[in-house]
Amino acid sequence: NYQLYQLNNAMAKTKEQLLNILDQFQLTEKVVSAEPFGNGHINDTLKVTNEKGEIKYVLQRINHLIFTNVDMLQNNIQIVTSHIRKKLEEKGENDIDRKVLTFLPTKDNKLYYFDGDNYWRVCLFIPNSKSYEEVTPELSYEAGKAFGDFQSMLADIPEGTLGETIPNFHNMEFRLEQFHDAVKNNAAGRLDEVKDLIEEIEKRAEAMCIQERLYREGKLKKRTNHCDTKVNNMMFDTETDKVLCVIDLDTVMPGFVLSDIGDFIRTGANTGAEDDANLDNVNVNIDIFKAYTRGYMEKAKSFLTPMEIKLLPYGGRLLTYMQTVRFLTDYINGDTYYKIHSPKHNLIRTKAQFKLLQSLEAHADEMDAFMSEWL
């Protein structure tokens, strides 16, 4: 599937083909080129320039192997961006086209264009903006505010409005089912070398399914989440260094608030790499956790329940555990999901995520105590 996707990708299109695709959209000015842009892993992204050489639009080919329901995907994004735009207008904000992504309809008023093989969409380019890759406490505080504000603006979207673009994406019970299937089938004959890790996962399984149980008991509600809360999914103003808007909205869908803070802690507060072979490098950076949480609570306290606030640090452990389970599942299955760069890559990733989980567990009391300020 992945090879098929690569063969089909946007980079294989000629300039004429790309300009013809762009011509299907309601653009407001003439464009002359579309060049590869950014370093996203999922979709193909191109920057589109006008005759003066200014970047005006962003053209994306949607990866329909991952987002199989493109109608739902674009409908979700349309609902979310319109909702945010309305909130910004009500607040009397200026410069709104830089504070929310603006997707352009096709000439027949569709949210995407299908060329017979691929699905395409176009949004306005946000001028004088930049994103960061590294994570500092200062940026984490800004990120917390940005994602808290994002959730806050979307808190009044009624449950049931948005679809799940990747079903069961952060559903721990589902991820454990996949894991148990992998163990049962032992497709790649690797069980013997990962027995200890399997035991560690089983030991924690029940405690890691709290959110699904609380939801069934009516004690936790589903909210609109971003589900990919990385520091590079925010655009900053190049002059003021303040966050303009949150981008990469493909995974915006109903879920639990623990997911968004949890994934930021997992990716941003790790002192090592996600696939660090030297486990001594991998620990939780508590300053990053505190900075993100402080920024997040400034914006999100107004709509969170005491139960949600109390569980936020648990979100970090949950998402790290979930990723450990997913990497190990893929290793046991024979590396069928994640791209690998060496035969043991998924095992190295599993061990690195598990080390981060152990570090988060060691700091659990300190992280829980930090939340008492808001309870």
Where in the sequence are the language-model features?
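Short, Lys/Arg-enriched N-terminal segments with co-localized hydrophobic residues
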Residues: N1-A10
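Conserved ATP-binding subdomain of kinase catalytic cores across diverse folds
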Residues: A34-F37, H41-E177, V257, A273-A277, ...
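Active-site activation/catalytic loop segments of kinase-like enzymes and analogous catalytic loops
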Residues: P254, L258-S302, L318-Y337
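Activation of the activation-loop gatekeeper triad in protein kinase-fold domains
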Residues: I247-V252
